[in-house]
Amino acid sequence: MVYNGYLKLNKKLEDNEYMLKIPNYEIQTFFKKGFIDKFLVSSNCFNPMMRALLEGNIEEFERRLQDIFLINTSFHDLKGEKVYHSLFLGMLIWLRDNYEVKSNGERRHGRYDAMLNPLDKIKPAFVFEFKVSKTIKGLTTKAEEALAQIKEKKYDAGLKEKGISKVYRIGIAFKGKNVKVKYEIA
């Protein structure tokens, strides 16, 4: 996809690891119509999931996210945090008309996985951290670790100073097709 121009190298992270980005509006539109609309929106889970997120109904968001993974993914494709990160980031692009969608941004003491910065400051911001659990029983612990990491590393620093009054800190843990979400409002 990089060689064909659908993705662009943004920066090198480590040996053989790179941050990629969608290079322009046309390809973002293609991605939205060709992937999001075709595979996710048609599943009847995607729109309600995004609506639940934006309304702050994180329990419903978690339920719908779980449904998306059960219906639209193959267990064999879900290996490692990068896969979940990419899938989730692809879903967040759907919100780009109202939010600045950021990935792997550096903040204070580390790098958050994803962030939604509202274009309208009366809307909430969302900071996401992802973890992969080795076991289904470990999902809750990993989601709590992800949430703690957001706080400890101050990934949401500066959002309040920008005039954003509500920030959702959301830790998400994955194991195969299983999902667990922990959150708090700052």
Name what the model sees in each region:
Residues 2-154, 179-186:
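Extended alpha-helical interface modules used as scaffolds for assembling large macromolecular complexes
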Residues 158, 162-186:
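Domain-level recognition of nuclease-like catalytic cores that cleave nucleotide substrates
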